[in-house]
Design a protein with these regions (language model features):
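Conserved Motif II region of HX4D acyltransferases
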Residues: 29
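Active-site-adjacent loop and "lid" segments of alpha/beta metabolic enzymes
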Residues: 1-18, 22, 33-117
Length: 117
């Protein structure tokens, strides 16, 4: 699935550039028509999308890939969301789409600090 999504974005980015659209953000689309295994494979290989030289947006907050794996509910999946946001940031995600802003801000602050030490 990772190669399929990467190939899709390679084509779409070329179309954007050909149309004069230069500001492109890549969102791998966690949860959209993918299995839980597909979503975790995308997250595990998120760094390959840097080949596109575009900022990466990750929207995994409260997704079924978290709460189903944890046998929880979307509202109760904050710990799982925090873990996956951390993993995404460690692989170079530039933008997080979140529901729980305070928790995400703390993840960003700690992750940025860890990258400096």
């Amino acid at each position: 699935v990772v190669q399929d999504v990467l190939d899709y974005f390679i084509r779409k980015k070329a179309q954007c550039l050909a149309a004069g659209i230069n500001d492109v953000i890549i969102d791998p689309g966690f949860g959209f028509g993918k299995t839980i295994a597909h979503n975790y494979a995308l997250l595990k290989k998120l760094s390959v999308f840097h080949l596109l030289n575009c900022p990466l947006l990750v929207g995994i907050s409260r997704k079924s890939m978290i709460y189903k794996l944890l046998d929880s509910t979307p509202v109760d999946a904050l710990n799982g969301t925090t873990v996956l946001n951390t993993l995404a940031l460690q692989q170079g995600a530039a933008i997080l789409r979140v529901h729980d802003v305070k928790a995400a801000a703390e993840v960003i602050r700690i992750t940025e600090y860890m990258q400096k030490v």
